[in-house]
Design a protein with these regions (language model features):
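A generic structural signal for short beta-strands and their flanking turns/coil linkers
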Residues: 1, 32, 44-46, 61-65, ...
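Short glycine-/aliphatic-rich beta-strand segments at the starts of folded cytosolic domains
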Residues: 3-8, 67, 124-132
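Extended, well-folded interaction surfaces typified by the phenylalanyl-tRNA synthetase beta subunit core
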Residues: 6-12, 16-20, 31
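Short, solvent-exposed beta-strand/turn "edge" segments of beta-rich domains on protein surfaces
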Residues: 15, 57-58, 119-121
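Secondary-structure boundary elements
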Residues: 28-35
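Short, charge-patterned binding micro-sites
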Residues: 36-71, 113-115
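An aromatic-glycine-centered, glycine-rich loop/turn in mixed alpha/beta architecture
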Residues: 78, 83-202
């Protein structure tokens, strides 16, 4: 049984890297009693994968996690929960969030078809929001982006150098002074389109 979870990663959890976040979920699911499938072999581990590892220092309101489940049954040590044969997806969301730290919250839980592709291969892009203390910076970035046909970045490795056109990978950039008014700061918004199939709950 395959499941797809959508979750937020906020606050000080921005300083937790991808591997530590994976370990966090492994312990969280064990604590919740979620009946997760394990790999076979000498060192079995929970079968899960992320759509796109989030960079260190970033928060997110829309991360995706693919998970293999044996069942929707409770598989833990709480005798009261063990009395119920199975839980719904919404009930599991409540159970997971109740056992989380308040900075990582599951906002969506859906059972997927067995032949569904991993979310990593379905996700085509993401939306980033950048905030600035100086209100004139977003406008400068917007003008610079639109005035140049290319934005070349030279990526250097130990063996070679490679020029990459950053603009080709940023379909839209816009500034907003109203959308995030509660933040009391202006920002630059990098808009992308998500792959619609099975990615969003909408």
């Amino acid at each position: 049984m395959k499941a797809r979870l959508r979750f937020n990663k906020m606050g000080s959890m921005m300083y937790i890297g991808h591997l530590d976040l994976m370990r966090y979920f492994q312990k969280l699911f064990r604590r919740c009693g979620l009946d997760v499938s394990y790999s076979k072999g000498f060192n079995p581990h929970q079968i899960m994968s992320f759509a796109s590892p989030l960079g260190l220092g970033l928060t997110s309101i829309g991360e995706y996690l693919d998970l293999s489940l044996e069942s929707f049954d409770y598989n833990g040590f709480d005798s009261e929960k063990s009395g119920k044969a199975s839980y719904t997806a919404d009930e599991w969301i409540d159970i997971i969030n109740a056992n989380s730290n308040g900075l990582v919250n599951v906002t969506g839980f859906r059972i997927m078809p067995d032949d569904i592709k991993p979310s990593m291969s379905l996700l085509s892009a993401a939306t980033y929001r950048v905030e600035f203390e100086q209100t004139d910076i977003p406008g400068q970035i917007y003008d610079f982006f639109n005035e140049n046909d290319e934005l070349i970045y030279t990526k250097e490795t130990k063996k070679s150098k490679k020029d990459i056109d950053l603009k080709a990978n940023i379909p839209v950039i816009e500034t907003s002074y109203e959308l995030f008014a509660r933040e009391m700061s202006s920002c630059a918004v990098f808009d992308y389109e998500y792959e619609k199939q099975y990615i969003n709950d909408d």
